[in-house]
From Swiss-Prot:
Region (Disordered): 259-331
Biased composition (Polar residues): 262-291, 319-330
Biased amino acid composition, Low complexity: 306-318
Keyword DNA-binding: no
Membrane topology category: Multi-pass membrane protein
Transmembrane segments: 7-27, 31-51, 65-85, 92-112, 191-211
Name assigned to this protein: Uncharacterized protein L248
A GO cellular component annotation in the UniProt record: membrane
Main localisation: membrane
Keyword set, alphabetical order: Membrane, Transmembrane, Transmembrane helix
Source species: Acanthamoeba polyphaga mimivirus
Length: 406
């Protein structure tokens, strides 16, 4: 409290008084301004406390006077700072200045649009712009060369540091009273509560929004909780089959018997031909480990089953022949079921067919072949005359080929 007597000679108080004198006497501003009233009240209270310091020995009276001085000092500094900031912004964003720029830009764009049709008339504004640009650049370069900025930066920095130091000293002297300490403690408590709110609510929300996580931020930071990936990913393709059609690659690892058990009816003469053909394929053959031999072998079995089905369906079916057809169908169904099991076992494998190949024409061709019964006709022709099927000039094969493309 002894330093209150020295505040009248403080440089910051003298500077504030000089600023008020220049503002209210030279610029003739209204004396009834709140800022001027605060400064006058502060000076009167400070002088009264300095003169009557020895007589005001009571603690309550001195404590109240220091609190009043503290409040007035804070309000004066806040008003001056706000005034400086507002004056700077008004100078930069002055309405008339902005209006002049807008009008000049509109007029210039109008002139350029009118002169757009004639390229020769555009030379004048372009030359003017180049001239102004060059002159402004020369003035700026000259200004920078002739003025040494380092001393200006040094003295400006020293001046503002000195102001901050004096403000801090005055504030520390005037804050040594009971009411100011209570207010400062409450303000610090509010600030701490705001910080806790920011750390507990806003920061976790920002972290979860940034990383796309909905879990507790503490568990995420401590690596306790697992990352919750988005659940909208469509993984249903893993449950589907890789291929819907039958491929010969699936026949490589397929274990099938060497012969098809096809019961034959003695009353059906066409079945006798199929028996002979079946006997031709049932001759013992040395097993080969190559894929091509296994493909040919299984392909012959499929064609034989198709040929037997077509021959049985073309004649009048007796009870015995009906049983034969059912057995053939059972063999074909068994073979297809085995193929399906192989494909299901390969569900996770990648397709071997190139993805960029257009299979629409091949699919339509195969559909026409199935609808027209071309596969059964080829199998029937092969069963009757196997040597004629390999002939390209066979008229029956040409006719079947034309029917496939319809």
């Amino acid at each position: 409290m002894d330093n209150i007597q020295n505040l009248c000679t403080n440089p910051l108080i003298i500077l504030i008084g000089t600023y008020m004198s220049i503002k209210y006497y030279l610029f003739q501003i209204d004396y009834f301004n709140i800022q001027f009233g605060l400064y006058v009240t502060f000076i009167i209270s400070l002088l009264y406390g300095s003169v009557r310091f020895n007589s005001l020995q009571q603690k309550k009276l001195m404590d109240g006077l220091i609190f009043i001085l503290h409040v007035l000092f804070v309000l004066i500094c806040f008003s001056i700072k706000s005034e400086i900031i507002s004056g700077t912004l008004n100078t930069i964003f002055y309405f008339g200045f902005v209006k002049t720029i807008i009008i000049s830009v509109v007029i210039g764009s109008f002139i350029l649009s009118e002169l757009d049709n004639n390229n020769h008339n555009r030379i004048i504004p372009e030359k003017m712009c180049c001239f102004c640009k060059q002159n402004i650049k020369k003035i700026m370069v000259t200004f920078v060369k002739n003025i040494d900025i380092d001393p200006i930066i040094y003295w400006s920095k020293t001046f503002f540091v000195k102001l901050y130091t004096e403000f801090k000293n005055i504030n520390s002297v005037l804050s040594k009273n009971t009411r100011s300490e209570i207010i400062i403690d409450r303000i610090c408590l509010k600030i701490s509560l705001i910080k806790m709110y920011l750390y507990s609510v806003i920061v976790p929300y920002a972290i979860s929004s940034f990383f796309g996580m909905n879990n507790d931020y503490k568990n995420i930071i401590n690596n306790i909780d697992k990352i919750d990936y988005p659940g909208n990913l469509d993984m249903s393709f893993l449950e589907q089959e890789v291929f819907d059609s039958e491929h010969l690659d699936d026949l490589d690892d397929l274990d099938t018997p060497d012969t098809l058990n096809v019961p034959i009816s003695t009353n059906n003469t066409d079945n006798l031909n199929s028996v002979k053909t079946n006997q031709q394929f049932n001759t013992p053959v040395a097993k080969s480990n190559t894929k091509s031999n296994r493909r040919k072998k299984t392909g012959k079995k499929i064609r034989l089953a198709n040929q037997t089905t077509s021959s049985n369906s073309s004649n009048n079916q007796s009870p015995e022949s009906t049983g034969t057809n059912n057995n053939v169908v059972d063999n074909k169904t068994l073979l297809r079921n085995k193929l399906r099991e192989k494909r299901l076992a390969r569900t996770g494998s990648l397709p071997t067919v190139p993805q960029n190949v257009d299979m629409s024409m091949i699919n339509s061709l195969m559909q026409n072949m199935i609808n027209n019964g071309s596969l059964e006709k080829i199998a029937t022709e092969f069963a009757k005359n196997p040597e004629n099927v390999a002939d390209i000039n066979n008229p029956k094969l040409r006719k079947l080929a034309k029917s496939m493309t319809k």
